Regions:
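Absolute protein N-terminus
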Residues: 1, 20-24
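Short beta-strand edge/turn micro-motifs at domain boundaries
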Residues: 137-154
């Protein structure tokens, strides 16, 4: 459950234009949700869905930043070669884990309900994955990194 929250929390560091305001952050999140929902609702193979979900994640998530954040202070002791190798391995792990978890949702119904500007660089967007008979309701907080207005990321 904790990994799910982390994956979803980081899932929306976006690709928007100009300076990102809170309304733009929630629109970005909703847009990303819609892209993923469209893939998950299509009548295509699981493998193709996974491939498409990985593309969405690569477009919207700062996987490298998440990976180094996960390492904590250990990252300071790594050589440049180790950092490059770690980044490659973490990206592969992240994309595989993320897509395999999401692909089981055939028709996710996610509502964006709130947003909060933390700073000029960060906006939190709150959403709710509505529960069904098969899965519980899940709150999802999206941390949007807006330092680069040309390409905000989760």
């Amino acid at each position: 459950m904790k990994i799910r929250k982390i994956i979803f929390t980081f899932f929306i560091y976006l690709i928007c234009s100009s300076k990102l305001y809170s309304i733009e952050a929630d629109v970005f999140v909703q847009s990303t949700i819609n892209r993923a929902s469209e893939v998950l609702s299509e009548d295509i193979s699981k493998e193709i869905k996974i491939k498409e979900l990985k593309k969405i994640a690569k477009d919207t998530v700062d996987i490298k930043r998440i990976g180094f954040y996960t390492l904590g202070p250990i990252r300071k002791n790594l050589t440049d070669d180790q950092k490059i190798r770690y980044s490659e391995l973490f990206e592969e792990y992240f994309l595989t884990s993320f897509s395999n978890r999401l692909v089981v949702y055939s028709n996710p119904n996610i509502d964006v309900y709130d947003k909060k500007i933390l700073s000029e660089k960060f906006v939190i967007v709150n959403s709710l994955l509505k529960g069904t008979e098969e899965r519980p309701e899940v709150k999802i907080d999206w941390r949007i990194y807006t330092k680069n207005p040309e390409k905000p990321l989760i």
